[in-house]
Amino acid sequence: MNAGVETLDLRPLPPVERHKKIFHKWEALQPGEVLRIINDHDPKPLYYQFEAEQKGKFECQYEQRGPVDWIVNIKRT
């Protein structure tokens, strides 16, 4: 793990387990730290969930947008 970056590869996980795993990792982050998510589809629904539950507490930035893998960095603010 890079300093301040926690990478979570969701591709091997069943879809039903993914959001639970993401929010478990998210809760452990300190302000300024980043959760780097690697996924096999665009995690846009995850963004909407963060917007509803964590509004004002995160910044989201795509590092890669498909076509096979999506990488998103979610920073705790």
Residue ranges and their predicted role:
Residues 2-77:
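Positively charged, polar, low-complexity stretches
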